[in-house]
């Protein structure tokens, strides 16, 4: 196995589970610091220990000579036959995923040209509907600060001096906002082990 082929395949494997911009910014140490909200990757690694060494192998063993075949092996395993589907009118990523017992995230991993579940499909395109079976576990740890809304409650007051079908808004409700600082781990594109809440601060009170 050529080391350049291996390095390229590992790179393609990684980009199946993380946006290229996020990966590049982490590797180049050019992530933007969080000022109000946002996220940064704190650590990135493989669960497995990968050893590269010279040696002799049997002529009956599989030898990966190009990036594509090795990437396919790393993503789908040794015995997975690649299955394709031809996009028809009305198809969406969600509908194709559901029909083939995939979740949309697995579809996106198998078809990295599509960036989100809302990406438009072109009629006649061949898409990969093979269930992934990764041979490696790509892990990264994230610190994220985000704002979540606190919905206000509607309060109804009755006025006996008004008609029964009369209504008016006396005080407009205001949605509150809580700023949450959290840590979590992502393995092969899936958040694992729950979320650790570092802090939770109300920055805007709700008004019912």
Pin down the residues of each PLM region.
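Extracytoplasmic
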Residues: 1, 35, 45-47, 51-54, ...
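Primarily a LysM-type cell-wall glycan-binding module
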Residues: 1-4, 70-101
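Cell-surface/extracellular proteins and modules involved
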Residues: 5-27, 92-106, 115-117
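Extracellular LysM carbohydrate-binding repeats and other cell-envelope/extracellular binding modules
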Residues: 26-77, 103-138
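Short, recurring structural edge motifs at helix starts
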Residues: 82-85, 94, 115, 166-172
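Serine/threonine-rich low-complexity intrinsically disordered regions
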Residues: 142-208
């Amino acid at each position: 196995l050529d080391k350049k082929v291996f390095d390229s395949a590992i790179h393609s494997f990684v980009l199946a589970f993380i946006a290229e911009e996020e990966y590049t910014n982490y590797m180049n140490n050019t992530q933007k610091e969080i000022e109000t909200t946002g996220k940064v990757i704190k650590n990135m690694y493989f669960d497995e220990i990968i050893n590269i060494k010279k040696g002799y192998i049997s002529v009956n063993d599989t030898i990966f000579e190009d990036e594509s075949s090795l990437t396919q092996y790393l993503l789908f395993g040794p015995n997975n036959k690649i299955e394709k589907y031809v996009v028809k009118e009305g198809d969406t990523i969600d509908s194709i995923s559901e029909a083939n017992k995939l979740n949309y995230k697995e579809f996106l991993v198998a078809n990295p040209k599509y960036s989100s579940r809302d990406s438009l499909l072109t009629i006649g395109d061949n898409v990969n509907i093979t269930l992934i079976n990764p041979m490696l576990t790509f892990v990264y740890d994230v610190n994220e600060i985000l704002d979540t809304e606190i919905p206000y409650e509607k309060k109804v007051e009755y006025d006996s001096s008004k008609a029964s079908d009369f209504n008016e808004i006396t005080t407009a409700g205001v949605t509150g906002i809580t700023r949450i600082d959290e840590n979590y781990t992502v393995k092969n594109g899936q958040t694992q082990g729950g979320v650790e809440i570092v802090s939770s601060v109300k920055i805007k009170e709700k008004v019912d």
